[in-house]
Amino acid sequence: MADRTDMLDGGALAARTLREAGVEVVFALHGGHLDTFLTGCRRYGIRLVDCRHEAAAVNAADGYARSTGRLGVAAVTSGPGLFNSIGGISAAAADGVGVLVITSSPPLGEAETRELQGGLDQIAAVRPITKWAHRVTSTSRIPDLVGLAVRHAQGGQPGPVVLDIPIDVGFTSVDPSKLAAAGKPEIAPRPVPPARSIASLAELIDASERPVVVVGDGSLAMDFRSELDDFAEATGIPVFRSGLSRGGLTHGHKLNAGGIFSLMALPALGAGTPDLVILVGASHGLFLGGRRFYPMCAGAKMAQIHLDAAEILSLIHISEPTRPY
């Protein structure tokens, strides 16, 4: 039996696992259900940023993820706290942003007793707008399930996840040597695309006279900023950004050609239209110029690289579809 001083409560276990995952900051709005988690964040050196509304906390985590390419984490309290955050969770879901929302709920043993901030199935409510949502029922499973939440949020096409740690589970202390087996709270390196796809794309580039690259909102999750710089400089191909992109070439780079509407303006400027468009992490729709984008590229071959296989070939024929894993 561990000495009481060696025991860790559920909130500390959650914070420790997030720190192991590289999390440095959590955006939060305090609620008593979260006390052990917030105390655990201080214990393990995770900076807490206090927010005035739960949706703002999730929006801040979303913005952090978009601007850094790292996991954004928000903490909101039980019941109305989580329901106040649904607008932020929905935005992260729509744009494929990796955000982990830590929440809580009334004690498991008080279900159906008109408990404080209870009475509604939180997980059922957020499941349609998340990649994954789960309620922890055992303190010893917290490291395992926090790690799983991290992998769900960042693996494949990123998106929001919700992990509910009920107040009694979060406040219970356990012997750290007796925890359930847990995987690492990180995603494995992505495999490279098939050699055949790379060779086909290289052939398209060699055969083109006016190729362009369009980088989209998925570029941060794909984490290739330095490679994109190297590619542009080696090929001389200009790089444009879709309306949602926070990636692309570094600011001031000579081949940073601006936003998608700069590309669409080329014919009016007498510059002609591209004969090859390479979409990198760019999703079809309004922020790629909507349906006006496709007539402008009617004579061009299209290549697309995207984490989400369902996004490839949507709305338009792609000459070379490439999934980077």
Task: Give names to the regions the model predicted.
Residues 24-25, 66-103, 127-180, 201-204, ...:
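Structural signature of the thiamine diphosphate
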Residues 40, 63, 105-128, 251-255:
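Active-site-proximal loop->helix
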Residues 32-34, 54-56, 77-82, 103-109, ...:
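Acidic, glycine-rich active-site loops and adjacent beta-strand->loop/helix elements
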Residues 53, 112-116, 188-200, 260-262:
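A general structural motif
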Residues 66, 217-305:
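Glycine-rich, anion-gripping cofactor-binding loops and their flanking helix/strand elements
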Residues 8-90, 94:
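N-terminal cofactor/phosphate-binding cores enriched in small/glycine residues
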Residues 316-320, 324-325:
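Single conserved hydrophobic/aromatic residue that forms the stacking wall/gate
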Residues 2-32, 140-141, 165-255:
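Cofactor-pocket helix-loop regions in the catalytic cores of large enzyme subunits
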